[in-house]
Every structure is written in structure tokens, then in C-alpha cells.
Amino acid sequence: GGLEDTETLGVLARTHKDLGLGARDPALRSKHLEAAFRLYERAYASSRQRGAAGGAYYTGINAATVAVLRGELDEARWIAAEVADVCHAAVDVAADPAIEYWRRATLGEAALILGDAPAAARHYAAAMALAQGRYGDLSTTRRQSRLLAQHLPVDDEWLDEALSIPPVLVFTGHMVDQVGRAASRFPAALEGAVQPAIRAAIAAMRPLASYGSAACGADILCLEAVRELGGETHVVLPFPAEEFRRTSVEIAAGDWGARFDRLLEHADSVTITSDHRASGSAAPFEYANLVLTGLGRLRAQVLDTALRGLAVWDRGSGGESGGSASV
């Protein structure tokens, strides 16, 4: 019946595995890990019997991983060697890159369990080349490899580099000075010097995604640089775009308005944190700053990668509420 298909057995096994890893009581941990192993083992045997290679190496490598977690290294290595054979027999030069990614990642995990670090590194490198920006898949593989390394007699220092995921960027910075501003912070004449400095800083990080606002000046320069370098741009505005454009973009001379429009049109997401502007209050800006930093932090945590910050501001300025210094 439905309870015997590979996918259902895999979900049940994953649930027991997670419960086991989260259990503080050793007896409860052992109980859940044993249940996970039996379910993965059953699904693996069923997939092999049906000749379903994909299901076989998915459930098989998970059975081997749970065996490692249970301290059954001989059994883990026996299963891992068998899974590696299944993967090698399943080579398909016309395979979808996503399918081939998991075959290669599985070979990497099998090699790790078998104690063959050079082979693991080769397979992980091949998987990385096939990932094509699917950072969720990469983070899953990275977590699994770290989990294995914690329970195996292997040197794991190379794993983070072998399965590296670009960082997430949160940026902030001053707006270009409004005409007639008494205390200058970002004179329009400095754009030509600031722009390449921002691009160089972002190019050194190569973020997969960025989170920030879109005011004239540093925000727009950061968004343009990230987009030019191929990263995602996620814009967070404190109130609707039309009003934000009027109050935080068009205040400076130049083509900031047109650049703002282009960036919002091509942004991966635009989040509006309030449906109106509270005139005279910094609260909408403070809240938007909390949201954009929170979104960046959450994305970094989900992908198990670093969170980086970039600020373009005058350290000598007071740092008004809701301004650059508050991020």
C-alpha cells in the first residue's frame, strides 16, 4: 500500500532520524535511530528490488548515515560500498543536472563513510559544478557531510571549502546629499569614487543574495553592484514605492529615480513593511531595518552560510534613528 512506497518510508525515516538527533535521553535517541535505520533499510531493499536506482541510492545512503550515527561503522561501510556501486551503474550522460547532482553528492557521502577523502572531494566538486545556484540542495549536502564527519574518524577541515556556499549580504549607507543640506555626508560629486569602492567590496564577497533598501546613494549603488555580479537583490521599503521614491530617491539631482525604477522592476523580491508613511517619525525606517536584517539573517541560517554586512556611512555623523548606523 501507500505506506510501503519509497517516498513515504523515507519521510517516516527522516522524522525518526530528526527525533533521534534531537533527543537528550540516550534510550530515546537509540530507539528513534533504530526505527529510522529499519525504515531506510526497507525502502532501500524495495527500491533495489524494483530497479529504481534513484530511490535506492537516496534511501541507501541515508541508511548508511544512520548506521554511522548508531556507531555501526562496519554495517555503514558495507551499505555505502553497495550504494556507490548502484550510483556508478546509474551513470546517464543525458541526465538532468539536478538528478546527476544527487548521484554525485551521494557518491561523495559514500566515499566519506568509506574513509576515502580524495574520492569524496572529487565527487563533491562535481556536485558543486552541477548545482547551478540550487543553494538549498548544497546546504542539505553540506549539513549531511558535517554530520557524518562528526561521527567518523576523518579530517573534516576541507569540507566547508569543498561545499562552500556564497554569503548573504545586508547593506546600508547614506543617501546622496539633498541640495542645500547643511552638514554634508555624501556629496553627489563623490559618487564616482564611492561606486567602484562598493563594487570592489561586493565583488570580494560574491554574495548569493543581498537585502537592503533602495534610497538614492549607497543603497542603489549596492543594488546595482550585486545585480551586475549576478546575485539576488531583495529590496525592503518602509512604505509604498511611489512615496518612497518621492521622499528618499528624487531628493537628489541626477537619474536616481530611473535607476530606482529599474532596480525594483528586476528585484527578486520587494517587501513593503508599512502601507503608509508616518510623517515626522523614524519608526517606519527602524522597522524596515529590522525586517531587512532579519530576512538576511534567516536566509543565511537556512542555507547554513555566512551573513556579511556592508555599510557606506560617515562614522562621524550622529546616526539618526532608522538611518545607516541603526542597521
Where are the regions a protein language model picked out?
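Acidic/glycine-enriched connector segments
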Residues: 1-89, 164-327
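"A position-specific structural signal for the A-helix of alpha-solenoid helical repeats
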Residues: 11, 15-18, 62, 106-113, ...
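Alpha-solenoid helical repeat scaffolds
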Residues: 18, 22-25, 69, 73, ...
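TPR/TPR-like (Sel1-like) alpha-helical repeat modules
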Residues: 37, 81, 85, 117-135
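Short coil/turn linkers that connect adjacent helices within long alpha-helical scaffolds
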Residues: 49-52, 91-95, 134-136
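A short, acidic, amphipathic alpha-helical segment used as a generic capping/interface helix at domain edges
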Residues: 87-96, 100-104, 109-114, 122-125, ...
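Eukaryotic RNA-binding helical-repeat scaffolds
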Residues: 118, 155, 162-170
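Terminal, low-structured helical/coil segments at or just beyond the last alpha-helical repeat
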Residues: 137-163
